[in-house]
């Protein structure tokens, strides 16, 4: 999370929010290639790398998935989300209760047929800025693990 210093930047003053959001730590991801070649199935292509990063992060920092209010991915879509949850379970990590996906927040999979994800850069930036940062600043959420797939 990017920090927000209200005294210097005025960030959040317009709506009365004063809580600072800070980066607590990072884990760098790695490429995990399961050989998915279908450009319309980006969720399945990105889920293995997301799983590897989440599991590595939790191990590196000595944390359980429940430490985070939300574990947020970019745009795996509903297909990729199911794969991610299954892969994490296989590695002994249950994220089923606190995983959310920015693409699933931004789009309506039922009416827009967006099941496999793909627009992770746009979804990550937009939903982090417009949805998660305000919830962190207000204190509604305390900690998120942000994995911008």
List the model feature ranges, each with a label.
Residues 1, 17, 90-130:
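Conserved catalytic cysteine-centered active-site region
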Residues 64-67, 140:
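Short loop/turn motifs at secondary-structure junctions
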Residues 39, 73, 117, 121:
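Glycine- and other small-residue-rich loops at beta-strand/loop junctions that grip anionic moieties
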Residues 131-138:
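Short basic/hydrophobic patches in alpha-helices and adjacent helix-turn junctions
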Residues 76-91:
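Short glycine/threonine-rich loop-to-helix capping motif typified by GTGT followed
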Residues 74-75, 147:
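Short His-Asn-centered micro-motif
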